[in-house]
């Protein structure tokens, strides 16, 4: 059995075995489960109540153990693991505060983003010490390259933080974030292979594919467990950093188009509401609810319908990226 196959099945099987025990453990220590926003679609208040969160612990454990055993400790893999675990810690604190207060509010958005950016910027600055001037260059598409020079570290940190929070926003329906994560890691792993990136980055993608697939088994509608911020923030950061390490940050925006759309829907909604409130005295909304997957729920789409259609969009965009933009 070759190394990629061994890593995939190890992460998948370990996650599949660990998940049921972890779900039972979470139900014992937290009977209320993940707090649900009162403004959420009505069915969420019924179907998602008392569902345990922090399932990201299973994904991270199942992913990182094979890396620890079989993947060489290159600068790339050390940075990936360090950033992923750092963002997992931020997510854990956020989840813990929510569960403790039995509220959907944890760390404030400003505090969370500030800590994330500092962590990512420090990580990228230290990593730069291992590389030549090519580190500051990135590909746009079709071999076109741009050099960010001294601005590259902040740019890379922005990608990591943006990806982290975009995945967090997407994690609002059963199976939605997990399917998008799997599709994105498959695409980034394929791009990494085709561009002859460091093998450790490819193996990193493979182990997260296996672990997230096993989690998805228990996260499909009706979900038995949610990944929580400890999962979405850390895995989102891992996705963004993977695109940075293979120098395909711009292409990641196409591959992860759903993450981009989810984030933009929130930004547009907030800005439009503030603008109309300032101009007319009363705020107006463009969407029924954001992130945009909730808008489609309010329109009458089922959770599974949204998850599958969003996945189709991601697959089409990924194929387009590999076929025409790489």
UniProtKB/Swiss-Prot annotation:
One of its GO terms (molecular function) is metal ion binding. Its EC number is 2.7.8.13. Pathway: Cell wall biogenesis; peptidoglycan biosynthesis. Catalyzes the initial step of the lipid cycle reactions in the biosynthesis of the cell wall peptidoglycan: transfers peptidoglycan precursor phospho-MurNAc-pentapeptide from UDP-MurNAc-pentapeptide onto the lipid carrier undecaprenyl phosphate, yielding undecaprenyl-pyrophosphoryl-MurNAc-pentapeptide, known as lipid I. Pfam families: Glycos_transf_4 (PF00953), MraY_sig1 (PF10555). Belongs to the glycosyltransferase 4 family. MraY subfamily. PROSITE patterns: MRAY_1 (PS01347), MRAY_2 (PS01348). The chain crosses the membrane at residues 3-23, 51-71, 77-97, 113-133, 143-163, 175-195, 199-219, 225-245, 250-270, 306-326. It catalyses: UDP-N-acetyl-alpha-D-muramoyl-L-alanyl-gamma-D-glutamyl-meso-2,6-diaminopimeloyl-D-alanyl-D-alanine + di-trans,octa-cis-undecaprenyl phosphate = di-trans,octa-cis-undecaprenyl diphospho-N-acetyl-alpha-D-muramoyl-L-alanyl-D-glutamyl-meso-2,6-diaminopimeloyl-D-alanyl-D-alanine + UMP. Disulfide bonds: none annotated. This is Phospho-N-acetylmuramoyl-pentapeptide-transferase. It is found in: Cell membrane. Its cofactor is Mg(2+).
